[in-house]
């Protein structure tokens, strides 16, 4: 455990949109089952673990890379749009637009692309885990079936953090 880390406090770097759509609810449930747990959240999932004093990070990636990790979501993507949205495409780094399609909007992240689609600005391809809530609520429609993707949301950490008792407990809970 690094200086400044406590056995009941988790410092987690997580994309805002993934926290809002998937992780937040699960962290709340873990905290309810584990009295005294505290969270420190940061948005820079690619932050240096030592400099940011991180326990864990959530990354949209093909795998854990040189870190230890577990996939939190299946590697699936889906094309979505709001009811009555234009046919314009919303792009973001890593979004596989159809051949010949040109982006009318370029977003910086899948979360911005999802927000743009929810606003009726067009259609986009996003990780299924981000869109599931909006699809279930009827705020978005799927324009086709989910399809395999190269990337999923991974919970990662360097080996020393990954082996710690507190991290193992949260990893076990989130991957159950």
Predicted features and spans:
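C-terminal regulatory
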Residues: 63-152
């Amino acid at each position: 455990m690094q200086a400044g880390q406590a056995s009941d406090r988790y410092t987690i770097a997580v994309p805002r949109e993934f926290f809002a759509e998937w992780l937040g609810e699960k962290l709340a449930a873990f905290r309810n089952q584990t009295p005294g747990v505290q969270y420190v959240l940061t948005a820079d999932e690619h932050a240096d673990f030592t400099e940011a004093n991180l326990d864990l990070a959530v990354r949209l990636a093909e795998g854990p890379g040189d870190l230890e990790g577990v996939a939190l979501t299946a590697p699936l993507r889906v094309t979505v749009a709001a009811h009555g949205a234009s046919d314009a495409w919303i792009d973001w780094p890593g979004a596989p637009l159809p051949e010949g399609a040109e982006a009318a909007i370029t977003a910086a992240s899948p979360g911005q692309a999802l927000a743009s689609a929810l606003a009726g600005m067009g259609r986009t391809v996003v990780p299924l885990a981000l869109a599931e809530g909006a699809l279930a609520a009827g705020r978005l429609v799927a324009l086709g079936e989910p399809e395999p993707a190269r990337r999923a949301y991974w919970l990662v950490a360097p080996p020393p953090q990954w082996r710690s008792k507190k991290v193992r407990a949260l990893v076990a809970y989130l991957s159950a």
